[in-house]
Amino acid sequence: MSTITAADVNKLRQSTGAGMMDCKKALVEAEGDFDKAIQILREKGQKVAANRSDRESSEGAAVSFINADNTKGAIITLNCETDFVGKNEAFVTLAKDLVERAINFSNKEEFLASDFNGITVAEKLIEQTGVIGEKIEIGGFEILEGAFVGSYVHVNKIAALTAISAPIANAETLTKDVSMQVASMGADTLSYKDFDPAFVESELAARIAVIEKDNEEAKRLGKTLKNVPKYISFSQLTPEVIKQAEEDAKAELKAEGKPEQIWDKILPGKVQRFISDNTTLDQEKALLDQNFIKDDSKKVGDYVKGFNVEITGFKRVTLG
């Protein structure tokens, strides 16, 4: 049997990331054969992975990578079982290594099948499952290209990408701010104009059903009833609807005894409140129609207009 030296153990540890004792045991079992020892460690990983395949892996790290000319970005989540492992330096380093490789692929399946120092990425994850002792897998995987792409990562839990139409002077600031918005608030589409009318109607019906059910219970308990909405998107607010809202506001002011000469100062605010109260779907799911988190006096779309560019895409991944 070959003599196993500390240098041999350290070399295997550097190659696989396995613990010192695991590396020594593998080298002893392999009688000093380095390649065989690596295979032994991988087989251990496969056994651990098989035993933990049904475990929930909702912890981990969300990471991002942008290429040198800011025209392409990647975000992934590397998932594990516990927050303790998710915060481990070696684990986060692996996540960052993986996302730098991920940028060269269009989807997660291609990436998992790609080479990682002689084995596939999928096999590397199995290997690391054996090393760490927890289920390790790629969760979220998103790629985004554009004239300029920027990113934002929130405490290694959520990552977002934003692409804009031109590489302007303040592109990094804009894309980071919008990515922060995407990470914090989420969004399904860019604008309310992208909503299918049938989707809006189905959402409205679903929300009305929930509110009416809640109101039945509130009425039974003698509590205040919730308002049942007629509209939830600006796409439903026709000029006639807006005009009627203005007329209703005038009637309200008249009933309150407000002098007509001050109505022009009050009406815009009331109409704007009507619009805000009846566009909840837009505020939840349409990025440009959300209140900007860094200045809620304006919409994201208003903030973006100040840069004279357009948002051409956005992506988001999150743990859990």
From Swiss-Prot:
Record flagged with keyword Protein biosynthesis: yes
Gene3D superfamilies per record: 1.10.286.20, DNA helicase RuvA subunit, C-terminal domain, Elongation factor Ts, dimerisation domain
Main location: cytoplasm
Compartments reported by the entry: Cytoplasm
Superkingdom of this protein's organism: Bacteria
Keyword list, A-Z: Cytoplasm, Elongation factor, Protein biosynthesis
Signal peptide feature range: none
Biological role: Associates with the EF-Tu.GDP complex and induces the exchange of GDP to GTP. It remains bound to the aminoacyl-tRNA.EF-Tu.GTP complex up to the GTP hydrolysis stage on the ribosome.
Name of the protein in question: Elongation factor Ts
Organism the protein comes from: Flavobacterium johnsoniae (strain ATCC 17061 / DSM 2064 / JCM 8514 / BCRC 14874 / CCUG 350202 / NBRC 14942 / NCIMB 11054 / UW101) (Cytophaga johnsonae)
Lineage: Bacteria, Pseudomonadati, Bacteroidota, Flavobacteriia, Flavobacteriales
